[in-house]
Amino acid sequence: MTLTKPPTAHPSNLDGLHNWITENCSSGAVPVLTGMNGDMDTVGSAISLAASNSNMMACGLHLGRISKRVCERLNAPFRKISNSSDLPKRLSAVIIVDAASSSQVGFDLPDDIPKCIIDHHASNNWELKDGDIYINMPVSATTEIIADYLATYSPETMTKPVRELLLAGLLTDSGRFKHNQKESFRSANVILDNSDIDLSLIHI
């Protein structure tokens, strides 16, 4: 099945996402793949989401300049891979973040396992099969979707480094709120809630 439009965003999207992650992580490795441009939104989303389950690991072809600097500063776990053969042998499923099509991953994905796509782009060129799930919300950055998911289903994952990764993704994709949607301010509040992070001190 090919979706020509993203599904309408509503809270049950995150319910479905949580159920999908729980089910697939219970039976094997679930790599969280970035878009091949390696920008801060895709990398921040992947590392933050992967931190919520020991069977997930953030992977991708490339770290962009900002992503590399932020990951080195935070000692954030990210595995560089060149193709699908570098993925774990016992795969349960794959998650792809911040990519509007499979071509944006940079290599062919395995056909025989479920996939989850989490994205904020209006365009969608994914072909979905049984067992796949597609989450798309009209926000400025994919890290906003990940922040809502973690705050609701895995609040213990919202450590200071994870919050900084989420913020970095939001700030870069929104141009530090210069071309953001109103929802981005709410997302920033979710990320900063009960933390000692000073937004003005986040340099990217």
For the regions a protein language model found, what residue spans apply to each?
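A structured phosphate/pyrophosphate-recognition subdomain
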Residues: 1-37, 45-53, 126-202
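Anionic-ligand anchoring segments at beta-strand to alpha-helix junctions in alpha/beta enzyme folds, i.e.
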Residues: 27-88
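Short, Lys/Arg-enriched charge-dense amphipathic segments
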Residues: 52-63, 81-89, 104-110, 179-192
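Hydrophobic/aromatic residues located in beta-strands of well-ordered beta-sheets
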Residues: 56-58, 115, 166
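Active-site cofactor/cluster-binding pocket
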Residues: 72-132
